[in-house]
Amino acid sequence: MFAAPLGFLRASALSFLCFFVLVALPASAPAQVTYDQILHSADSPSNWLQYAGTYDGHRYSSLSQINRDNVSQLAAQWIFQTPQPGSFENTPLVVNGIMYVTAPEDLAFALDAHTGRKLWAYKRALPEKLRACCGHTNRGFAILGTRLFLATLDAHVVALDSATGNVLWDVQAADYAQGYAFTVAPLVVKDKVIVGVSGGEYGIRGFIDAYDVATGKRVWRFYTIPAPGEPGSDTWSSPEAAARGGAPAWVTGTYDPGLNLLYWPTGNPSPSDDGSGRKGDNLYSNSILALNPDTGKLQWYFQFTPFDLHDWDATEVPVLLDTELDGKPRKLLLHANRNGFFYVLDRTNGKFLFAKPFAKQTWAKGIDVSGKPILLDTPQPGETEGVPTCPGAAGATNWMPPSYSPQTGLLYVTAREQCDVFYTHPQHFVEGRLFLGSMYVPSTKVKDWGAVRAIDPKTGDIRWEYKEFSATWAGNLSTAGHLVFTGDLEGNFIALDADTGKPLWHIQTGSAIYAPPITFELDGRQYVSISSGALLLTFALPAPAR
């Protein structure tokens, strides 16, 4: 079915914003988070221990106290307000009753998850002239033992004491003045913390790093653009183009412990929309990289958009799924890409299995049997003659995480229906300055809109769609209560029926939502949290009468 868009909310929906916590319960003591707990995160749904909840990227919780029969009774329990406005894209961690939160400008907090009471705060002294593109955001922590790991806008990786917020170690990964930055939530694998760099709009050379969790010593670095003479270097027209070729890695990857493979997505080549100086496929931009997490060695890669001219990063969370396909058990990697196609790969070797459009696209006839796009014969953008293209530069989806429910067998994707008119604007590279080579403006012929789409990963078919007024930036969460939680640019926090897409509940938060929700359990009660504006809001069903 296709659900209707959410209508205007009555003023009473805002009443919860006047709710304040008057009595703060004592928080639980910080506890050791073992690697075994992280490996088996799905077995401990009371906590939220890593960016996607589990290594496979499912963002699914087996908690079901909140379900489609009672979700209409959800009510705000507490609200925490950060002092820093901006794009609040954080995924909180919850460990034994303590919530760990990051906010714009690399602020960080520990909160009592019962009440929202602040336990400690960390504020980084950032340089005045940061080069970070697209908002001074941060997407969250990783944790192991009593160490929290934070990747910062000035291109450092930091370990904090989870009990106090004190700095345990701080290492510089790159020079922020050259355009390097971190916005990614780190990922812990074994005894390493793994991060991918931002800065594709500044002509950086992208990389993925692994650091020793105890000391901060860098263990390995994988450059996402090959050095001269390395495999893939011939996909760049010159060493100079490759040296400033971008391919950042700014979204958290996923991990298969059985195969011991780390799957990390990469972003656009640089300059993002002018290919005149970088002819070729531009490896390993717009790709999924399968790396050995012990060594950083590349095991295989798959590139979605060779020679990208539209800023279509592949920095969307790769989702791992074990299922039958065409009558055979397969280990799959699912990827709804910014270019408008949904891809299914064999994650053991990177073999392309199939792809289908999941949003409007006007640049390709389809994808061939090898996984390469079959391009339409369209004119190239000029400095004065623009070319309308769908999707636009922000993509048919973007960094906002999808979720997968084993209950329904569906992948839930935030889709964006937005087209842009692209122009070229050639420019010379200057270190530390924006290096785009183009400009683009929204198409005036079609209004943008958004949707949550439920995709069958075995066929690529869209089972249902929930339409939203604007092209949204919220991720989603699915639960065993037959629910999908999401948000929209109009500030609505929404619960949908996971089987049908029917809207079951919503509340107006007062600000646009740019984050994915999480869920956790305390003292037998299930909670759901979402970031909105400068607020972190937490909801639950009414407490049982005593």
Name every feature range the model reports, one short phrase each.
Residues 33-76, 224-231, 441-442, 448-450:
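Blade/loop signatures of beta-propeller domains
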Residues 48-52, 87-107, 132-157, 181-202, ...:
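Repeat-blade elements of multi-bladed beta-propeller folds
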Residues 61-173, 479:
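N-terminal cofactor/phosphate-binding cores enriched in small/glycine residues
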Residues 80-91, 121-142, 170-185, 202, ...:
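Extracytoplasmic beta-rich repeat domains
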Residues 113-115, 161-164, 213-215, 293-295, ...:
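Short loop/turn segments that connect beta-strands within beta-propeller blades
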Residues 206-217, 281-296, 349, 450-456:
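Beta-propeller blade signature
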Residues 444-498, 502:
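Loop/turn-rich, solvent-exposed surfaces of beta-rich toroidal or solenoidal domains
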